[in-house]
Amino acid sequence: MSEIDTNDIKKEMDNKNYRDPTDNKELLKWTKKKRKRSNDSMHINNFYRYNPPNFKLLASKYPTFDKYIINKTEKIYNIDWKDSNATKELTRVLLDHDFGLRIELPDNYLCPTLTLRINYLYWISDQLKNLKIILNDNDNDNKIIKGIDIGTGTSCIFPLLGAKLFNNWSFIGIDIDDKVLEYAQNNITINSLNSKITLFKNEKNSDILLKLLNYKEGSNTFNSSNDDHQDNHDDDDDDEEYFADFCLCNPPFFKDLNENNNNKNNNPKSNCTGSVNEMVTDGGEFEFVKRIIKESFQLKCKIRFYTTMIGRKVNLNPLINILIKQYYLPKNQIQTTELVQGNTSRWVLSWYFLNKSTNLETKENNNINNNNNNNNNNNINNNNQFLTRMERRKLYREGITLNLDSDDNNNNNNNNNNNNNNNNNNNNNNNNNNNKIVEIIKLILDNNDIIYKTDENNIKYECKYLLNNVIVGSSIKLDRDIEFLFTIFIDLTTRLILFKPIDPKINNNNNNNNNNNNNNNNNNNNNNNNNNNNNKNNNNSCDGEIINSNLFFILKFLENIKNEIKLK
């Protein structure tokens, strides 16, 4: 090539802003833009949410990681995130330093990113707690939780992290490659977790989960010589209605090798290496998850909670439509969430089935349980349709009211109110308020017509909006260090805000009847009502908007819980 041609090429590269990969200054500029010191999208319990890795400390402690630092003259150390060897060593030292896990990560296999997977595990834990409430499960909180990892990989990352993060979790890891299972078994043995993790050898293109129905310890397992794990799974499927509490999966993305290669060419910043079995499957990610869905409708409640990661958002809604339209699964039994690490996002699709023995039914137009008052059926929308954010905000502005008193209770209360004086009325109101707290909680937990699928980040946003704009004057503050309180708050408020507004005609009719019966009381209590209205107006800056008293009672209930919980 002539000198003139070379100069022309350099000019063209300058015009197109090409970055020389050997230029460390340019590399540092790019990596500084990419790396964030905190990530509010991580799960609240994720260790790295407020404690990003200290590369300088890691480099001083691990010489094998120190050689990948590219900016030792800077205050904050960094690595080349496109270098697969650097990211692999980072994963290895983080597992050792922060979790006490020592693993071997062979070349040419997937290197797992930690924060996404930690978010995934904590999200599953949250959903299992919610599912326990929905199913009225009275199992001991320390009961062994059994998980199934579909495609466990050489690192066996989900079972290893799950066993470290949750003392009562155990796993069965499934894979189709003998060599992969050898590496995975070695990582399990190194960390002395044979008592919690078992590996299962499956065949390519065979059933993904159905074979586990006939699974027995020591049968078709990779580590069949292990005796320690047998105590945890000894014929549990015969004694219980379900075989496992949950399954999780990070499915292969691509249909074939050409699609994989095209993805690398279109995204030169991508650091994606892995074996063919890890990256490619017939039909790609969409068909693989479809197979899991199909098998789940054969297994039903044998696995309590089905989950899978989705790498391409374009596949999420079609898979949800398959669950709803093809298999007629109610929408309130489907959940999704987004997992975020830096600029990388993954999605999770999950669904569950209801046992026949539970009081909840799977029909879309069911009313709330008969254990609650029949009067509530008029106040709750019977259609399982997802509300948009604008619709929910409209609910906030209008205020949400739930008629929690039965007809009998209303009659009794009316008779009592007619006979009691003003002081007794005040006492009855206090007692009714206390009873209403219990009734609200019971109604929420027993109601099966609640739209339960919503994004976790949207939940937090909407709850914050609710606190700031509806519960005006409330002095209650959520302590982010209290996991239990925060989880309950998110769960209860999310369920409650998804109720449809009450028909004003129904309310007007009820109010007219009550007003006719209580004219005497209203005349006697005008002074008290005026005083109460003045107090409400002083506390409420919403220009006449109705404060949702039900949510206020829930918050007061949570405040009592908060006082009983010790801070971490």
Swiss-Prot record:
GO biological process terms, semicolon-separated: rRNA base methylation
InterPro entries xrefs: DNA_methylase_N6_adenine_CS (IPR002052), METTL16/PsiM (IPR017182), METTL16/RlmF (IPR010286), SAM-dependent_MTases_sf (IPR029063)
Catalytic activity line of the entry: adenosine in U6 snRNA + S-adenosyl-L-methionine = N(6)-methyladenosine in U6 snRNA + S-adenosyl-L-homocysteine + H(+)
GO molecular function: nucleic acid binding; U6 snRNA (adenine-(43)-N(6))-methyltransferase activity
Pfam families noted in UniProt: Methyltransf_10 (PF05971)
Keyword Ribonucleoprotein annotated: no
Stretches that traverse the bilayer: none
Keywords assigned by UniProt, alphabetized: Methyltransferase, S-adenosyl-L-methionine, Transferase
Gene3D superfamilies: Vaccinia Virus protein VP39
Biased composition (Basic and acidic residues): 7-20
Feature: compositional bias, Low complexity: 365-383, 409-431, 507-538
EC number: 2.1.1.346
GO cellular component: nucleus
Region of interest (Disordered), ranges: 1-20, 363-383, 403-431, 503-538
Residues that hold S-adenosyl-L-methionine according to the record: 117, 151, 175, 250
Family: Belongs to the methyltransferase superfamily. METTL16/RlmF family.
Function: RNA N6-methyltransferase that mediates N6-methylation of adenine of U6 small nuclear RNA (U6 snRNA).
Protein name per its UniProtKB record: U6 small nuclear RNA (adenine-(43)-N(6))-methyltransferase
Organism this protein belongs to: Dictyostelium discoideum
